[in-house]
A protein has these predicted regions:
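Cleavable N-terminal export/targeting peptides
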Residues: 1-29
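Subset of outer-membrane beta-barrel
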Residues: 20-291
Length: 291
């Protein structure tokens, strides 16, 4: 059996877990993931469209980020992210993004997002929303000629975010996947596999303009047979040296993360890794442009 067919077989064995967990497991941006994913109260770059759209209200100009990931040293398995934001109006920003996890011509999970954020009521307080389109496909399964196989599945969800940003600290609340989408690639399945809704509460503090400390709690909606209401956490820190080089570290629900960044004028390069005893380590690389 070829490597690709073996991957298809493995994915089909864990398909419910893949559909539920894959869309939740991907975390966007090497900067954010180097900080343990504690980014809900930070949300100050183009990946805010995924983390907390309320952050769009505080940005300026165009921001573009692209990310590639090598997953667990498996050559055919990867994550890709692209996001673009624009804030050219007073107190308002918009953005769009795409995230993919999969194996070429075998299995794909795609997420498309459209976001907007605006400062409201008082200076420093913003609200934002993100419309999500989830698409699931396993073209490699056509090899098995299963009459019950669907070519793909699609559903929709909505995120709502709030952010209060003071001079040295910020606090945030985000609700993800409102509407709790369900998808299935097997036509005989009565109920699709859910992508759980989740509440995230976070805070961040900036020390002497060079050190950022952030943390958050994540509370998924309980779905019998799929998700328990188990609270997860993320902690992270970022330190900048002469405004050009950054070191990052974090903890994501007990798993250690680390990262670094290099900024040259309008270009920033970020790298991160997530250490998992099994199945291995995730390596992420991001390029970001501010213009």
């Amino acid at each position: 059996m070829s490597v690709r067919r073996a991957i298809v077989a493995a994915l089909l064995l864990i398909l419910p877990a893949a559909a539920q967990g894959g869309f939740l497991a991907i975390e966007e941006g090497a900067r954010a993931t180097g900080m343990g994913g504690a980014f809900t109260a930070v949300a100050d770059d183009a990946t805010a469209v995924f983390w907390n759209p309320a952050g769009l209200a505080f940005m300026d100009g165009f921001k573009l980020t692209g990310m590639g990931t090598r997953l667990f040293s498996v050559d055919d398995l990867s994550e890709n992210v692209v996001s673009l934001t624009y804030s050219g109006w007073e107190k308002t920003g918009i953005g769009a993004g795409w995230a993919r996890t999969g194996v070429d011509e075998v299995y794909d999970e795609n997420t498309f997002v459209l976001s907007a954020g605006r400062e409201v009521f008082r200076d420093g307080l913003s609200v934002g929303g993100t419309f999500r389109i989830y698409r699931l496909a396993a073209p490699g399964y056509e090899y098995y000629n299963d009459p019950n196989f669907n070519d793909g599945a699609q559903d929709y969800a909505f995120d709502l975010g709030f952010l209060y940003r003071a001079r040295t600290w910020s606090a945030a609340l985000a609700v993800r996947n409102l509407g709790q989408p369900e998808m299935s690639l097997i036509s005989t399945t009565e109920d699709g596999d859910p992508v759980s809704s989740e509440v995230r509460v976070g805070g961040a503090y900036v020390f002497r303009e060079v050190m950022l400390i952030s943390g958050e709690l994540r509370i998924p909606k309980e779905v019998p047979g799929y998700y328990t209401r188990s609270v997860r956490y993320a902690l992270g820190t970022e330190i900048w040296f002469v405004g050009a080089f950054a070191l990052r570290a974090g903890i994501n629900d007990g798993k250690a993360t680390a990262g670094l960044g290099l900024r040259i004028s309008w270009l920033t390069v970020d790298a991160s890794l997530l250490s998992v005893r099994r199945p291995g380590t995730k390596y992420r690389l991001s390029l970001s442009l501010d213009f």
